[in-house]
Design a protein with these regions (language model features):
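Buried hydrophobic packing segments
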Residues: 115-118, 122, 137-145, 334-338
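Short acidic-aromatic active-site loops that bind/stabilize oxyanions
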Residues: 101-111, 127, 131, 207, ...
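Active-site C-terminal subdomain of aminotransferase-like
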Residues: 262-367, 371-374
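Compact, charge-rich alpha-helical regulatory domains located at protein termini
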Residues: 1-37
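Short loop-beta-helix segment that forms the pyridoxal 5′-phosphate
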Residues: 99-103, 119-139
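N-terminal entrance/gating region of PLP-dependent enzymes' catalytic architecture
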Residues: 33-112
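Conserved C-terminal alpha-helix-loop-beta "cap" of PLP-dependent enzymes
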Residues: 344-427
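Conserved PLP-enzyme active-site core in the AAT-like
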Residues: 2, 15, 106, 136-299, ...
């Protein structure tokens, strides 16, 4: 506990003497009094009961919706109780990076199993131990595709706007040119894409399903990019992968996505995790930690951090990225979730999302909230709103329902997951019809 105990009076006196002053006021003599804090930095200490009471009052200011129909990157999914029980184990709740394999086999094995499941989910050869979130995973993947004469990144305009902004921010600092391909009828405009794909194109990034919930023509987009010898980065929803073809089966080179649906609560925006997986050919360009399986001195199975020459503790500023230890707990949460659900459970969750979203879309269309895009969708979709979208949002909020996300004056992006009951969806219709 010594490191948590403030310096004693004698220690302070000794330190002041070492720099040639007698008091703290002497030490800060060069600081103008006009910038001095007049109030204490923190209040006086309080009892545990007083602190809990104060924090409870702060929490009560939040609006917590039990009925949620909003996605747009963060999704309300059921989290099996076993997931929390596993990750709350003291051995996992640490920010320590497991460099010393001989004392970290439990954490290393857990991360290895997470990587294995991400590879199975995406159909790829190798996965890292995750990065900060889905947006940073997408941006990092762009750098994996860079070559000396092929640097341009082509991004589908149907991608999540926040992901696009993150990619642009990352690429600006490295001088990587970015071209945004416009949307057409809710999908990537293939004619515009054909123009954007030139000989200097390093990669194409698109999402499946895209921001509007619409399913893209993945095979065509991938073929168009490969015809120009560009790599393909596919942003995917991990729950949707319970039903759809994997990026590996479709021919993508890199698969990335937001891992929040895999057992992480929405938590006002974080912490989340970004999963990344690629073909073996691109393995050495993957950022972040990679755990590998090997044999110990006795020939037994063991786990280590492998391919470490890519990382910042060896290559410093030339490392492929600067990903720190905090993501390990989120990755292990996703691993625990995938283990608890299994392939059949994940497929069942995906089927429920699909069926409930289509039920909601049909019910909304019946009261004038018609689909904007007549295209296949998974669990998100855009509707027109006969009243301003902000007004529809408020009507539902007044009844304790979080509506879809207004994305235009008269357009709303809806989402339904396995958490939404028929009664909740019928309540949405009743409120919008003015029956409640």
């Amino acid at each position: 506990m010594g490191s948590y105990v403030p310096s004693s009076a004698e220690e302070k006196k000794s330190m002041l003497a070492a720099v040639g002053v007698q008091t703290l006021d002497d030490l800060y003599a060069s600081v103008p009094e006009s910038v001095y804090l007049k109030e204490p930095v923190i209040p006086e200490g309080q009892s545990e009961m007083e602190v809990i009471s104060k924090l409870s009052g702060m929490v009560e200011k939040n609006t917590v919706y039990k009925s949620i129909f909003r996605g747009a990157g963060a999704y309300h999914h059921y989290i099996p109780s076993i997931v929390k029980n596993v990750i709350n184990k003291e051995a996992f709740r640490t920010t320590y990076t497991p460099y010393q394999a001989e004392i970290s086999q439990g954490i290393l094995q857990s991360i290895f199993e997470y990587q294995t499941m991400i590879c199975e989910l995406t159909g790829m050869d190798v996965s890292n131990a995750s990065v900060y979130d889905g947006a940073s995973a997408a941006a990092e993947s762009i750098f994996m595709c860079q070559e000396r004469k092929k640097t341009k990144a082509v991004i589908s305009g149907t991608s999540n706007p926040e992901v696009i902004e993150t990619i642009q921010t990352y690429c600006k600092s490295r001088g990587v040119p970015v071209v945004i391909v416009p949307a057409k009828d809710g999908q990537t405009d293939q004619a515009a894409l054909a123009e954007a794909l030139t000989d200097d194109t390093a990669c194409l990034y698109f999402q499946q399903p895209n921001y509007f919930g619409v399913m893209e023509d993945s095979e065509t987009l991938i073929q168009m990019a490969h015809d120009k010898k560009a790599l393909v980065v596919m942003g995917v929803n991990p729950i949707a992968l319970g039903l759809m073809k994997t990026p590996g089966e479709l021919g993508a080179d890199i698969a990335v996505g937001e891992g929040q649906p895999l057992g992480l609560p929405m938590s006002f925006g974080g912490p989340y995790l970004g999963f990344m997986a690629s073909t073996k050919k691109l393995m050495r360009k993957l950022p972040g930690r990679i755990v590998g399986e090997t044999k110990d001195a006795r020939g037994g199975r063991c786990f280590v951090l492998t391919l470490q020459a890519r990382e910042q503790h060896i290559r410093r500023e030339k490392a492929s990225s600067n990903i720190c230890s905090n993501e390990a707990l989120c990755a292990m949460t996703a691993g625990a979730y995938l283990t608890a659900m299994g392939p059949e459970g994940l497929a069942q969750a995906a089927k429920l999302c699909l069926s409930k979203a289509h039920y909601l879309a049909s019910a909304l269309a019946g009261i004038g909230y018609t689909p904007v895009y007549d295209k296949p969708f998974f669990h998100e979709f855009v509707t027109k709103t006969p009243i301003p979208a902000a007004d529809a949002e408020k009507k539902l909020a007044d009844k304790g329902i979080l509506s879809g996300l207004p994305i235009g004056e008269n357009e709303m992006l809806w989402c339904a997951t396995e958490m939404n009951t028929k009664a909740q969806m019928d309540a949405v219709i009743a409120v919008l019809k003015g029956e409640e």
